[in-house]
Amino acid sequence: MLHLYNSLTRKKEPFVSLKPGTIGMYVCGITVYDHCHLGHARSMVAFDVMVRYLRSQGFDVTYVRNITDIDDKIIARASERGVSIDELTAQYIDAMNNDTHALNILPPDHEPRATGHIETIIRLIQRLLEKGNAYVSENGDVCYEVDTFPEYGKLSHKDIEGLVSGSRVEIVKEKRSPLDFVLWKKAKPGEPSWPSPWGEGRPGWHIECSAMAMHELGEQFDIHGGGLDLQFPHHENEIAQSEAATGKPFANYWLHVGMLQVNGEKMAKSIGNFYTIADVLKEHHPEVIRYFLLSSHYRSPLNYSEENLLNAKKALIRLYQAVKDVPPQTEDSKLDEYWQVQFNQAMNDDFNTPVALSVLFQLAHEVNKSNSPALAHTLKNLAGILGFLQKDPESFLQSGLAEEEKLVIEQLIAERLQARAERNWAKADQIRADLLSKGIELEDGATGTTWRRIAE
């Protein structure tokens, strides 16, 4: 049975969906004012694998990942660039789609944008005003009054005083309490705005997600996810406003992905230590990046380094080598039940991908020993749930080399062929040894000599 670590209760719990066989999942997406960095990729890959696995187990999953396309940062960046907000957000949405496609991240079933749900947001704010959980401040903003929700802090597990002193709470004199947060911002000159019962303005960040999640999944759903940095204040505020409005639990399970770190610090645009997905893709194969992001449990911190990416590359080469020369699978062959069970046990333990990967390597070892099509097929199928090992092995094993390098290898193979024709075995063996020392293995067959990279 699937067990998930629920941030709300701080323990692993058996997963029971609201409606048997179906799952509603909402994950906070990106704010589109810049290129996605690897921290974003980690979260997106983690939830992508969760969705893939849940579907492989027969669940009908509705996966929602939003786009924040109106925000202070977006407005500021558009102003800096001298472009419209629509131009800016379109540019970075396209860039995000390119990144996710390269990393084999499946598109969500629904990808709502904040600007497309203004009326839904306004209606939710009206409910909160009617129930006495919100107020119109002196400056015209509509704010949520945290003191009206006694359970505030139940997700981050901090007391109210701790939240005030230990968080990035904006102190605004118009608020009744420092923890109160804006639901609707009164329009400022030159900023985008929409009409509302409280005048021209735009929605606050937190209310956008509550409104979009409930619009797509209903007032209650199964799983809400995002990066650990969103737990407070964003997710805490989502719970407060949503549950105050409906009187029901918002999401049953809260899942948070640990931070991607560089030298022990969170990778973040605000710190300036981030690596964009696009830049890393220039240096590393997409599957290598994906493997690296899954090499640590999703809740644990993960350190970015070239060494860790190199280790991911070597690991993938070993897996591709295992399936490279296996005879084709017959149509009536089934997956090996033993290895399926081992893999599922790992994934049922809160999506434990490091253990699942170890199962794949044990299986690859058996494939190497037996050359069994059934085991190789099982290996590819299980790895496919993690989103890799689906490329042509030859293509992957020769990837990452510049065309000039490939030409040099082919030239050396031709020289070796000539040396063998001349019975110059010493030269032929030396060429093979030189290439092997550079991680290139030659294979002589009936149709000629082929080459591939190997894990050094």
Swiss-Prot record:
Its cofactor is Zn(2+). Keywords: Aminoacyl-tRNA synthetase, ATP-binding, Cytoplasm, Ligase, Metal-binding, Nucleotide-binding, Protein biosynthesis, Zinc. The keyword Ligase applies. A motif ('KMSKS' region) lies at residues 266-270. It is an enzyme of class 6 (ligase). It is found in: Cytoplasm. This is Cysteine--tRNA ligase.
